[in-house]
């Protein structure tokens, strides 16, 4: 592994976790979005992540949730069908919040790896100056 591979790998992790956080923010914003039963439900987005040979990760795309979503009874909703149902996204807030915590922790860990690597590089430069 080269001298700056740690930074390259941590940078790819930061980018992946930022993409994950962005998709979760959108999913959470739409967790209560309902549509008519004849329409497509909001599709949650989940990054598709692949490892990079030599270290790191890359986001290759987004997996979309089920367009059918789930049917919920809400007879007072103006979008409800004759039977009182609307279509909602397949995921709930609890699932999204759990993933949000994981994405935040991953982002924080990648930041810490970057800081530690920079400190190590600075220390090595100081040794070289002596």
What are these regions (language model features)?
Residues 1-130:
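Amphipathic alpha-helical polymerization modules
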């Amino acid at each position: 592994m080269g001298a700056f591979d740690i930074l390259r790998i941590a940078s790819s992790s930061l980018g992946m976790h930022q993409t994950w956080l962005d998709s979760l923010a959108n999913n959470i914003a739409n967790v209560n979005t309902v549509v008519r039963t004849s329409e497509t439900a909001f599709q949650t987005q989940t990054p598709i992540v692949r490892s990079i040979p030599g270290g790191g990760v890359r986001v290759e795309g987004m997996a979309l949730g089920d367009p059918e979503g789930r049917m919920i009874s809400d007879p007072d909703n103006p979008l409800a069908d004759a039977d009182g149902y609307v279509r909602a996204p397949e995921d709930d807030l609890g699932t999204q919040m759990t993933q949000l915590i994981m994405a935040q922790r991953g982002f924080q860990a990648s930041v810490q790896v970057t800081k530690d690597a920079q400190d190590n590089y600075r220390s090595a430069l100081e040794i070289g100056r002596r």
